[in-house]
């Protein structure tokens, strides 16, 4: 027996579909307008709060597929750029943070033992709060996330809405642009870092950096004791950014603290950076390949048990 839909039913379904589409568009436009005109609704500044634990949670769930790890600040988000991923190599990007919080988490994930760990040095002075660490390593929270995936940071509505509504447009370098032209035109984009890190480091700040250096040494020693090879690297920052007081002082202290470790660095003039810090796609691939050239043979073959 063939089922038939009456003309009135078809009209009803058509109206229902139309109103659904209209309401969806209206809700989207209303949300965008409200977020742009009512600061309390604009949650974009909270994105790092969810992006950092989301990336750390992702590593905690998939560490067996990560015999090689690249750990660092938002700079690592371009190592490698999308589409250039290498099997067995996982990047842990900590937006608004540095390597310290990642090392704290990895030291507590005793079952996760990468063969090689690349650690970005440049922004390691950023503190690691106990709450950020517990959000990923607390066994009760981890059990809840295992049973209820919607409880993970990556499933948070702010995270999903931000990624859907505010994609980051990649600025590409064109062969007609010299490095000097690129550098000069993008100076305004690096002004924010000059404002944040441009002040001299006072005595309290120097003492605090020493505390973080000591923590770095303890965490790296613990991770190395499990059989992981740790390689440190300096991001090829624009000289204007690299010479800022706290960044320059931290870089000096890190090299003094780890003189016997393998270091990877390169001239900044080889790379095109969007804002004096973050790679364009091609430059990210170039620096990523430089890191990969320091891998021991067979490092990506399989994860350590």
Predicted regions and their residues:
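Secreted/periplasmic serine-hydrolase-like ester/acetyl group-modifying domain
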Residues: 130-228
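Membrane-embedded segments
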Residues: 70, 75-150
